[in-house]
Amino acid sequence: MASLRIGMTTLDRLGFSAARGIERHLSARLGSRRTEGLETTAESLGILDALSPTEQDQLVATAIRDARTAPTRITQLAQAWHEGDAPKLDALLREGFKEFPQLRKRLIDDRNAAWLPKIRSLLKGSENAIVIVGSGHLAGPDSLVDLLAKEGVSLTQQEHTTRRTAPATP
């Protein structure tokens, strides 16, 4: 959990706040409409808790070591996301997980596979649905986009109607 706190502190310093995230924005717009998660908070945090003590120590050491370069990487990730540049986003994410391929598998790939049945169910429903996931789940060969396309789901990347520049690197 210490590595998560280090990462969240860096994000907060750069102006990326959960209070200003897309989930809060859409929740306010949706009002009393039904919402549900693809997983619980406990399930997502459980992924980090399931790491061995050695893996947790390595993750904390890496977070501390990379604290100086994290703002630049985060800004690059945000820019790739805002530009809709999936290949660049995938390359940046893979670079970030280079030292921890098993963590990427657990945090991204395994969760994508686990979420597919729920997303399939939403797509078959009669109501409109919005699925919100982190950007790491949207790019690459095991992304939700790729997995859904393999199942024949037609996806269209939407253009931003407004552009927000990524926060400046301190």
Identify the role of each PLM range:
Residues 1-103, 107:
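Structured, acidic catalytic/metal-binding patches in enzyme active sites
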Residues 105-170:
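C-terminal soluble interaction/assembly domains
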